[in-house]
């Protein structure tokens, strides 16, 4: 009797805890994203959404350390010059390859009005592609928090952005 009751209850509870299948994802956040343009707004909810869609050169780790994301490594060659080596084999949503030109384009776009990121990265004088997988960033002087600032700058496909009037 106990064995039968245990089996019946087990089967009953298995139905209660079965996975639910739905076509809608519900996500709660403290505010609305104002745009899907990663350089248009510098505010929390937009960054939360952008982080789900885009990647940056670097990203904050769980203990707030700076981790590589699209960059596999970086170094400084002078007080005002940073060199980033870009991961190979990264593709955009349309299958095109990520290049250093896309990264330079994104940084330069983010530091140009009407972008809301201008003040965040105002110490950056220029970003340029040295090779397909090497980016150089020149600042207006030593910037010990540049890597932290770059965690908020997301990379777009230059070709896609230009084709779509961004």
Residue ranges of model-derived segments:
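Surface-exposed binding/hinge segments that line
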Residues: 75, 119-166
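Bacterial N-terminal signal peptides
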Residues: 8-16
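Positively charged n-region of N-terminal signal peptides that target proteins for export
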Residues: 1-4
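Sec/Tat signal peptide C-region and signal peptidase I cleavage site
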Residues: 17-22
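N-terminal lobe/hinge region of extracytoplasmic solute-binding protein
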Residues: 28-78, 108
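Extracytoplasmic/secreted proteins, especially bacterial periplasmic and envelope-associated proteins
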Residues: 48, 52, 65, 69, ...
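Aromatic- and charge-enriched surface segment that lines or borders ligand/interaction sites
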Residues: 72-114, 130, 136
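Sec-exported extracytoplasmic/periplasmic mature domains
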Residues: 58, 62, 79, 91, ...
């Amino acid at each position: 009797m106990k064995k039968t009751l245990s089996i019946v209850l087990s089967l009953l509870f298995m139905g209660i805890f079965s996975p639910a299948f739905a076509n809608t994802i519900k996500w709660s956040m403290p505010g609305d994203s104002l745009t899907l343009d990663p350089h248009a707004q510098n505010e929390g909810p937009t960054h939360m959404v952008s982080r789900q869609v885009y990647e940056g050169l670097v990203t904050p780790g769980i203990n707030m350390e700076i981790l590589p994301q699209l960059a596999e490594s970086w170094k400084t060659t002078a007080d005002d010059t940073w060199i980033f080596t870009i991961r190979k084999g990264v593709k955009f949503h349309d299958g095109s390859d990520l290049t250093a030109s896309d990264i330079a384009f994104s940084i330069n776009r983010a530091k140009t009005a009407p972008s809301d990121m201008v003040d965040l990265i105002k110490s950056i004088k220029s970003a340029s592609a040295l090779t397909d997988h090497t980016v150089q960033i020149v600042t207006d002087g030593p910037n010990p928090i540049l890597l932290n600032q770059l965690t908020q700058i997301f990379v777009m496909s230059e070709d896609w952005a230009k084709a779509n009037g961004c």
